[in-house]
């Protein structure tokens, strides 16, 4: 069973060092110093309370960003590159769903995923998310791409 807690500075540094290969390299983050200087993602002091780390024993397996919005709750997820396709994404999303539906019981949970990333799409579908609507174009700090919005209804 995974455990989680609010993300620490040392965990942020570790996540910045993760190195995805091939087409997944689009998910590589800038170095920690750059993230801090630009106040990006979990290095933004106004948003860092939204980020959680997930452990399997002593191993950091992933992190999430959980952000309440007007009509739903956005979740961003990252799994350690050497632990992808080992079931951690589903385990993490199970914990995220529990937290989100406890804190925001009437709001659906949603995420955005690059259309080509069928590995992630399949993981999210197994975790109870479904593609909503048509793909859309979006530019992120990691580049431009075509994305699906996937939704998990409030329980």
Where are these regions (language model features)?
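C-terminal "cap" of GNAT-fold acetyltransferases
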Residues: 106-110, 114-121, 126-130, 134-155
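Extreme N-terminal starter segment of soluble prokaryotic enzymes
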Residues: 1-2
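Glycine-centered small-residue hotspots that permit tight backbone geometry or close packing
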Residues: 76-78, 87, 123, 133
């Amino acid at each position: 069973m995974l455990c989680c807690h609010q993300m620490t500075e040392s965990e942020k540094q570790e996540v910045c060092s993760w190195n995805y290969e091939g087409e997944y390299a689009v998910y590589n983050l800038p170095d920690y110093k750059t993230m801090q200087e630009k106040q990006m993602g979990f290095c933004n002091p106004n948003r860092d309370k939204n980020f959680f780390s997930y452990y399997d024993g002593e191993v950091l397996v992933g992190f999430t960003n959980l952000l309440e919005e007007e009509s739903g709750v956005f979740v961003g997820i990252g799994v350690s590159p050497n632990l992808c396709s080992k079931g951690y994404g589903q385990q993490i999303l199970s914990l995220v769903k529990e937290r989100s539906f406890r804190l925001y019981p009437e709001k659906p949970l949603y995420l955005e995923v690059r259309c080509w990333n069928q590995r992630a799409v399949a993981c999210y579908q197994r975790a109870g998310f479904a593609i909503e609507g048509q793909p859309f174009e979006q530019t992120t700090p990691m580049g431009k791409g075509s994305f699906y919005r996937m939704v998990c209804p409030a329980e």
